[in-house]
Design a protein with these regions (language model features):
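Active-site phosphate/pyrophosphate-binding segments
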Residues: 2-40, 135-253, 263, 327-344
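Glycine-rich phosphate-binding loops that contact phosphosugars or nucleotide phosphates
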Residues: 36-184, 210, 245, 253, ...
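Peripheral docking tails and interdomain loops at the edges
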Residues: 302-344
Length: 344
């Protein structure tokens, strides 16, 4: 029996992701062909909140796998300052679960008017963002009842992954086992974290990632703030050592998220610095060496580093949910938040 919409939608994700991985692959390849005909020289991604973290994930994918320079737009350039940058050779991707935030819609519409090819990734095919775009990649995960983004966030990660792999001419079969990987990762989080909290609500939390784990770290920190009212902040493992490590001390909890791969040594360096400052650590990873060094570890399963963010995010959502529930907080009613946020 589930106790909240957030829990229900976390549990629903393995099946939804498996369906999206299979069902959206042909559309991703069709969109990649349409994009190829325009020969974009660079990509601009625009989003807010959780979707902005999915956009950062997209930046890593686009630059690493597709060889395209990718940047994140500042929506106020279009929506407040009335700027019109030269985007004639760009692919502009708007990411929004609702597709209704005016600043994201204005950015995409302005870029389209300026000659860019535009694409919307959204859970609402009839939304203003979808209507403002040349191309659309729908998430099709059904209405999201949880105020804090759960299934739409991991679906955005998968949608971006499918699109970029198709743009790069790569095989999409790596996602074939995504549903079972997500299910195994969620089960691992449930075994390790159910009934757990991150300790004293007054103590700070740092969430650390690198590479594909970095946007997941930002997202987990946001979830801990949203549903747990935590003083949580996300950092790159590299940036952590450029100053923020000074604020880490005994009583601080550090959550490290990342997959086995080229960033592992950087994450281990960050974890060593965290321990040297007297903080306790929780590691979410498929890297046994990184997990071995943690105070507590949640092993996850992923088919390669570029897909790992989905399993990492799913385990992180369960952590945020459990931290809120064990302290008597209602994850479906975080104060001051609304499901659809409209900013200019």
């Amino acid at each position: 029996m589930t106790r909240s919409w957030m829990e229900s939608e976390i549990r629903s994700q393995p099946a939804l992701l498996a369906r999206l991985a299979e069902g959206a692959a042909p559309l991703a390849q069709e969109l990649a062909r349409a994009i190829s005909r325009r020969h974009p020289r660079f990509v601009v991604l625009t989003a807010r909140g959780s979707s902005d973290h999915a956009a950062i994930y997209g930046k890593y994918l686009l630059e690493t796998d597709a060889g395209l320079v990718a940047s994140l737009a500042a929506p106020s350039v279009y929506s407040i300052y009335g700027g019109r940058p030269d985007v004639r050779d760009a692919l502009v991707i708007g990411i929004s679960q609702s597709g209704q935030s005016p600043d994201i819609v204005t950015t995409v519409a302005g870029a389209r008017a300026g000659g860019a090819l535009t694409l919307a990734i959204t859970n609402d095919e009839s939304s203003p963002l979808a209507q403002a775009s040349d191309l659309r990649l729908p998430l099709q995960v059904g209405p999201e009842r949880s105020v804090a983004a759960t299934k739409t966030f991991t679906a955005e990660l998968l949608a971006v992954w499918l699109l970029v792999q198709a743009m790069a001419g790569k095989d999409l079969d790596s996602a074939a086992n995504l549903g079972s990987d997500a299910e195994a990762s969620l089960a691992s989080a449930q075994r390790t974290l159910s009934g757990s909290s991150l300790g004293d609500p007054a103590s700070p939390i740092v969430v650390v990632g690198r590479g594909y784990g970095y946007p997941v770290a930002l997202e987990l920190a946001l979830k801990l703030r949203e549903v747990g009212r935590r003083n949580a902040h996300g950092f790159s493992a590299a940036d952590l050592l450029h100053g923020p490590i000074a604020a880490v001390q005994a009583g601080t909890t550090a959550v490290v998220v990342g997959a086995a791969g080229p960033t592992s040594s950087s994450l281990r360096d960050g974890l060593a610095a965290i321990h040297a400052h007297g903080a306790r650590s929780l590691v979410i990873s498929n890297d046994p060496e990184l997990a071995w060094e943690a105070s507590l570890a949640v092993p996850v399963r992923a088919a390669g580093e570029s897909l790992s963010g989905i399993s990492l995010a799913l385990a992180g959502q369960w952590l945020a949910l459990q931290d809120a529930l064990t302290r008597g907080l209602d994850p479906d009613r975080p104060p001051g938040l609304a499901k659809i946020t409209r900013t200019l």
